[in-house]
Amino acid sequence: MTETRRLRILITNDDGIKAKGISLLISLLREADFADLYVVAPLEEQSGRSMAFSLVEPTALEPFDYPQRVQEAWAVTGTPVDCVKLAIGELFKENALDLILSGINNGKNSGRCLYYSATVGAIREANLHGIPAIALSQSENIAFFQEAHMASLIRSLCEFTVAYKHTDPLGLNVNFPASADDSPWKGIRFTLSGNEFLFGIPRLVRTEGNRRYYTLYDMRDKVSEEFSEEYLALANNYISAAPLVSKNTPRATLSEEELAFLKDSFEQSVLWKASLNLEEDLA
């Protein structure tokens, strides 16, 4: 019997290499034990940087003594896109990566917010280089993340994303719901990205002479009259998984038939209810 080849997975994020979310993701991947793990992540938080990269100033790259066992770990003084570019073009150019993961982000990246997200920006960069990728984000706060059974789900998502064949590599944007009463997640749903939007309200924090300093961190939801399937999935305690090649993204490469096939394939390959004690079946 032929042994399945272990995947080579790059892990990055936008919360920084010391963040709780990336540590959780590595723990789950180590538990699933199907891949060799390589970490290239920002030294400092880079939230809201989208696909920005260091065009003018040099970016520093240095080995990082990661507390969990990984093949290699590197810290970068730039953005998540810088991390992906350096990983593909320098660190691992002789040994191709199979998949790139970004997260787990502290806060959701659903709806139109994915255009601002540096977590998702890293995934878009990976796709541009022909590498499949997954963004993972926890709604509200990383403290809401439920670790039970997640190693199995993460592995299923990874293997599905790598195996999916299309003209362009698959990018998935996965969001985990925040259960206010700690009720277990019901399952996972394949959705399209919604039109919901988080916008920042300018807040004056101080004035120095003629210069005024503002923050945009006070975020408010702007929801359409008709809720998207992504929004409803999260609101009803389901994990959402939205393809970045769907019709509302710049890379609108899937026909309706291909999108339907992707949805069917996802539901057949990734649904994890058979091995878990879920409260209800998926619709």
UniProtKB/Swiss-Prot annotation:
EC category name: hydrolase
SUPFAM superfamilies in UniProt: SurE-like
Localization: Cytoplasm
EC code: 3.1.3.5
A GO cellular component entry from the record: cytoplasm
Cofactor note: Binds 1 divalent metal cation per subunit.
Binding site for a divalent metal cation: D14, D15, S47, N105
Catalytic activity as recorded in UniProt: a ribonucleoside 5'-phosphate + H2O = a ribonucleoside + phosphate
Cofactor: a divalent metal cation
InterPro entries on file: SurE, SurE-like_Pase/nucleotidase, SurE-like_sf
Keywords annotated in UniProt: Cytoplasm, Hydrolase, Metal-binding, Nucleotide-binding
Alphabetized Pfam families for the sequence: SurE
Main location: cytoplasm
GO molecular function, one term: nucleotide binding
Gene3D superfamilies in alphabetical order: Survival protein SurE-like phosphatase/nucleotidase
HAMAP family in alphabetical order: SurE (MF_00060)
Family of this protein: Belongs to the SurE nucleotidase family.
Function recorded in the entry: Nucleotidase that shows phosphatase activity on nucleoside 5'-monophosphates.
Protein name as annotated: 5'-nucleotidase SurE
Source organism phylogeny: Bacteria, Pseudomonadati, Chlamydiota, Chlamydiia, Chlamydiales
